Amino acid sequence: MSLHNAIVDSCDVFFYNVGKQLGIDKIAYYGSGLGLGKRTGIDLPSEEPGLMPSEPWVERVFHHKWYAGETISVAIGQGAVTVTPIQLARMAAAVASGGTLVRPHLLKNDPNMKTENFPLSDNTVEQVTQGLYGVVNEGGGTAYHLRLQNIDLCGKSGTAQLMSYDAANRMGTKKMDGWFVGFAPRRNPEIVVAAIVQDTVEHGGEAAGPVVRDIVKTYYDKKNARMQQTATNDAPAQPPITKPLVATVGVQHP
């Protein structure tokens, strides 16, 4: 299976194998480099840093070596990994823009915006963004039902277990956390949205995906309306009409 199809089909087994080959410390290097496990610096109090586990972390906290089997869970974002929606939105924006990490703010525009860069190859960015585009826009993609007309929405769903399958069966519950993160357009993205729906029985694409889709659609609807209004205001004044304009629809004249 190719990387593209693994992203489009959301194939956990593919990424189990990738995680096994990389090892936990390399996963932690890329995860931390893209902002996981650290505060984003958004203008909100008590921001949680989340957790990107590593061998030094487990030795410091639990005083034992890292178990290789845990790498498999971390490779698909489970196990000890914890993230916030704003971290995922920031990470997705960084990947889509070639590695530029933006500090988020609660305002329309920041002329002095601070950024940092994490090195990502052009080939890596292209392959990942093509995969994320396929998730929404290729038949068989796990979020094909979220595609939008004339908008290149790219995205990825995620479904996080809240407990083991055995515990869930004992308690008679299958509730999960449903995630979706999306950006648009595919080239030079200008909006990124991350959503989580907690304690749901639906997967991320069904639970959180429509939230992201609707926000992106509303953004473009408002943007297009503003552009249309600007074009109308800037249009030259029309010359006065000197004779009446007559339109006939379905009328027979004698």
How does the language model describe each region?
Residues 1-197, 243-254:
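Beta-lactam-recognizing serine transpeptidase/beta-lactamase-like catalytic domain environment
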Residues 17, 23, 170, 197, ...:
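Noncatalytic linker/hinge segments flanking ATPase motor cores
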Residues 112-116, 129, 206, 210-254:
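Short, gly/Ser/Thr-rich active-site loops of penicillin-recognizing serine hydrolases
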Residues 120, 173, 200-211:
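Short alpha-helix boundary/capping segments
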